[in-house]
From Swiss-Prot:
CC annotations in GO: membrane; plasma membrane
Record has Cell membrane as a keyword: yes
UniProt subcellular location: Cell membrane
Protein name: RYamide receptor
CDD domains, per database record: 7tmA_PR4-like
Chief location of this protein within or outside the cell: membrane
Keyword Transmembrane helix: yes
Length: 464
């Protein structure tokens, strides 16, 4: 293969030889070219088709590990073996490789676009339910709405920009301003989620461990939420400062002047200590608080009453309600930890040069990146599944949409017809109480308006 758009190698050769990774060491004995050296990226960086970036203590480094670039990756020199053609209009350097194939890009679209859609719709619905329903405006639901806003920030800015720039285009097309903002918003969103979960656990801890103490008011909860966002914004502030656009040392990026968005720290030491500090603030400290509070809450809520102590029906209902809320929030905490902890541990391990040369690293990085991005669409599913009031709010909102309301109406009518004709499942029989027949006959008949039934085909009353 001849290189039509050639660069000059340091040795003066008029041809550019580029490593085709994950392919045999190809060489035509009849070719007359100068043997040279080219900087080959380690396997993880091959996702991005970059080659060499400074890795010394004074050079710029990748940094914290935002989702818009592959951070902390090390590189090694390799003999030049394969000569590749490329042009700025048709970038096909790695057409034989999985990462640049059309099938892989289809998989990327199928994995990331549903996250973007479901996260925006689900978290937007959560915010709307809390805002529009008076009885849903509780302290815990205010914190849940704050979580949803953070997930909307992640899904709207970070999810599409990261997968488009990393896996589809292989460069950053969104400009310098969005480079700063996207890296910043990703860190802020994770910090807001961690700190808000801590605030919820402390609120539940106080309410259950000391039930006679004054509860956190809604006004005080808004101040706590504002404080959470302020601390998150301040903690992540170094990230937009060191973020910027840079041309990696690859033939195509250099020739076509294609930039990537990455963090460029003054020294590797600063980057390492900030990454370590951010990991502690995002996960180590919050996870310690969450384990302590929910362990104490679990012991208190699921503990049996002492023998001889009376328990009324009201006490049983309150205990069941507390257990449901604790189960839901524990699920939220576990899902958050499972989604984001692997990706952040991977960013720390990339500081180890030997680990950065691990062959399966590109696949592990891709899987952990998708897992972290997918977190923003899980919380609404948890709320809908484990909380009856959120579930009722979701159902009522669906019935207000014309298309969904008609579909639900046709389905419910079909179910009733099947039940009456005997083709569907039989409805339970209700026994008539003859002793109250005379009294029931004098009462006004129950209203049969569709408005009274939240699952009917007509308009539904708002959730109160």
């Amino acid at each position: 293969m001849e290189h039509h758009n050639s660069h000059l190698l340091p040795g003066g050769s008029e041809k550019m030889y580029y490593i085709a990774h994950q392919q045999p060491m190809l060489r035509n004995e009849d070719d007359n070219y100068q043997e040279g050296y080219f900087i080959r990226p380690d396997p993880a960086s091959l996702i991005y088709n970059t080659t060499a970036l400074p890795a010394d203590d004074e050079g710029s480094n990748y940094g914290y590990g935002s989702t818009t670039t592959l951070s902390g990756l090390q590189f090694e020199t390799y003999n030049i073996t394969v000569m590749m053609n490329f042009s700025c209009d048709d970038y096909d350097l790695l057409s034989e490789d999985m990462w640049s194939s059309a099938y892989f890009k289809i998989i990327v679209y199928m994995l990331y676009i549903p996250i973007f859609i479901f996260a925006l719709i689900g978290n937007g619905t959560v915010c709307y339910i809390v805002y529009s329903t008076p009885r849903m405006r509780t302290v815990t639901n205010y914190f849940i709405a704050s979580l949803a806003i953070g997930d909307i920030l992640m899904s709207f800015f970070c999810v599409p920009s990261s997968f488009i720039s990393l896996f589809i285009l292989n460069y950053w097309p969104f400009g310098l301003a969005l480079c700063h903002f996207v890296n910043y918003s990703q860190a802020v969103s994770v910090l807001v989620s961690a700190y808000t979960l801590v605030a919820i656990s402390i609120d539940r801890y106080i309410a259950i461990m000391w039930p006679l103490k004054p509860r956190i008011t809604k006004r005080y909860a808004t101040f706590i939420i504002a404080g959470v966002w302020f601390i998150a914004l301040a903690t992540a502030l170094p990230i937009p400062i060191v973020s910027g656009l840079d041309i990696p040392m690859s033939p195509w990026h250099t020739k076509c002047e294609k930039y990537i968005c990455r963090e460029m720290w003054p020294s590797r030491t600063q980057e390492y200590y900030y990454t370590l500090s951010l990991f502690a603030l995002q996960f180590v400290v919050p996870l310690g608080v969450l384990i302590f509070t929910y362990a104490r809450i679990t012991i208190r809520v699921w503990a049996k009453r002492p023998p001889g102590e009376a328990e009324t029906n009201r006490d049983q209902r309150m205990a069941r309600s507390k257990r449901k809320m604790v189960k839901m929030m524990l699920t939220v905490v576990i899902v958050f930890t499972c989604c984001w902890l692997p990706f952040n541990i991977l960013q720390l391990l990339l500081n180890d040069e030997e680990f950065a040369h691990w062959d399966p690293l590109p696949y592990v990085w891709f899987a952990f990146h998708w897992l972290a991005m997918s977190h923003c669409c899980y919380n609404p599913i948890i709320y809908c599944y484990m909380n009856a009031r959120f579930r009722s709010g979701f159902v009522q909102l669906m019935h207000r949409m014309p298309g969904l309301r008609r579909w639900c109406c046709l389905r419910s009518v079909g179910d009733r017809m099947n039940a009456t004709s005997g083709t569907g499942p039989a409805l339970p029989l209700n026994r008539m109480n003859t002793s109250t027949t005379y009294i029931s006959a004098r009462r006004k008949p129950r209203a049969t308006s569709l408005r009274a039934n939240p699952l009917s085909c007509g308009e539904t009353s708002p959730l109160r």
